[in-house]
């Protein structure tokens, strides 16, 4: 993990599920400290490492923490940090959830670009895990897998019974396509006929047509899309954020189909159990 940021930066916004407005401050830290959250609104300001062992829940978003101190919807920010090779960072949050912003990683990318990044010493840079044997996690017809590969690449497929999305596949090779243009702009998405049910369950309180793409069976309610295949690109963004809990992204070809945060984090745990 080769970089931290040059100066602190602050971003404000509303959490997707909590509906609570929070302030996030990213602060540079010394080499070797890693990426970690700090709930500055709670007594003793508890620290929550951005690490697999702290995964608490993975239903519709990824939540880290322990009883009394959690942080939710961390995946878009963490995807940005790992894509930029920012490995040492304190993330101060004054609420229970990282704000959704526009539903993509673009706002994080823009904010970090304004302050810039600086490299750590070469001695402190660790090497990524290299996958040598296939690993798979599956639930019914959904799966996510890691296969040996000479480079790191991602292939993701989705299949929804909604005409605007339907079947989509997308492959991303970080060496060939820039995260900032290919992945970061892809926004979270949802379905009009599920909104009321999710809100009754206490979820998506902060969701709106300003921070998420929404479709019904026939059309998008808030076009235009940033890519024709924006939904599957966003799923790949989520996968990247969940795999970041390993530290560096392993060298592998990651293949996912109809997967979820739960399957993503299960694969990350299987990789950790196998190679650490």
UniProtKB/Swiss-Prot annotation:
One of its GO terms (biological process) is lipid A biosynthetic process. Pathway: Glycolipid biosynthesis; lipid IV(A) biosynthesis; lipid IV(A) from (3R)-3-hydroxytetradecanoyl-[acyl-carrier-protein] and UDP-N-acetyl-alpha-D-glucosamine: step 2/6. Its cofactor is Zn(2+). InterPro entries: Ribosomal_Su5_D2-typ_SF, UDP-acyl_GlcNac_deAcase, UDP-acyl_GlcNac_deAcase_C, UDP-acyl_N-AcGlcN_deAcase_N. It is an enzyme of class 3 (hydrolase). One of its GO terms (cellular component) is membrane. Zn(2+) binds at residues 76, 234, 238. NCBIfam families: lpxC. Belongs to the LpxC family. This is UDP-3-O-acyl-N-acetylglucosamine deacetylase. It comes from Synechocystis sp. (strain ATCC 27184 / PCC 6803 / Kazusa).
